[in-house]
Amino acid sequence: TKHRYISRDEFKKILSTPMYDNRLELARRAFIFSCLTGLAYVDIQLLHPHHIGMNAEGRRYIRINRKKTKVEAFIPLHPIAEQILSLYNTADDEQPVFPLPNRDALWFEIHELGVIIGKDDNLSYHQSRHSFGTFLISADIPIESIAKMMGHSSIRTTQGYARITDDKISKDMDKLMERRKKQSTGEKTNKSN
C-alpha cells in the first residue's frame, strides 16, 4: 500500500498555526499528537489516563493495545505531545484523555486544516500516523523500535515505511541535483556581468 504522509515543512506549518475555532483547534492538536505518537484516531479516542506512564528516569510514555491489531504500542512521549496532553484529561480514568467526536465528524476540520496550511492534496487524519512512521525512518530509528512504537503485528508492515522514504529520498536528491545545476549555471552568468 502507498502510505501518504505530510512533509516536515507541512508539519511545522500545522504546529505553528493555532486555530481560531475550538473544534478546529482540537482537530489540529489531535493531528499533531498523532504525528508525534503514531496513534490512529480510534486509539487516541480510546486513550485514557491509565495508558500514560512514567519510567524510572521520569520519561513519560504511552502503552496501549491498538484497536486494529490488538498489539501493544509503546511510545515514549515527545515534549510537544506532553504539552498537548497537559491541556486535556490526564487524571480522571472514567473519561478519555481527549474529548473527540467520531472520526467522520472531524473530517471537515482536518480537511480545512490542510487548506489553511496550503497543502496541495487533501489532508486526512491517517496521514498523521504515516507521518510518524516516516519521520522515525528518516531519523534512522531502528525498524524494530518503530514497529514497537506503532504497534505493528509484523515488521513487514513497518518496512513499507522504509520503502516509501527510499523512493522519496531518491526523488528529493534528484530535485536537489537539478537545483544545484541551475544554481551553478546561474552563478556563472552572474559572475560574467
Task: Pin down the residues of each PLM region.
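Basic, Lys/Arg- and aromatic-enriched nucleic-acid-binding interface segment
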Residues: 1-41
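Short, polar N-cap/turn motifs at the start of nucleic acid-interacting alpha helices
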Residues: 51-58, 120-121, 141-160, 171, ...
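Catalytic-site neighborhood detector that most strongly recognizes the C-terminal catalytic loop/helix
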Residues: 5, 66-70, 82, 103, ...
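Conserved tyrosine-mediated DNA breakage-rejoining catalytic core shared by Y-recombinases
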Residues: 1, 10-13, 37, 46-84
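Short basic/aromatic active-site micro-motif
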Residues: 26-28, 100-104, 120-140
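C-terminal catalytic core of tyrosine-transesterase DNA break-rejoin enzymes
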Residues: 32, 36, 42-43, 112, ...
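Active-site/catalytic core of tyrosine-dependent DNA strand-transfer enzymes
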Residues: 78-120
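C-terminal secondary-structure termini that scaffold catalytic or DNA-interacting sites
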Residues: 176-193
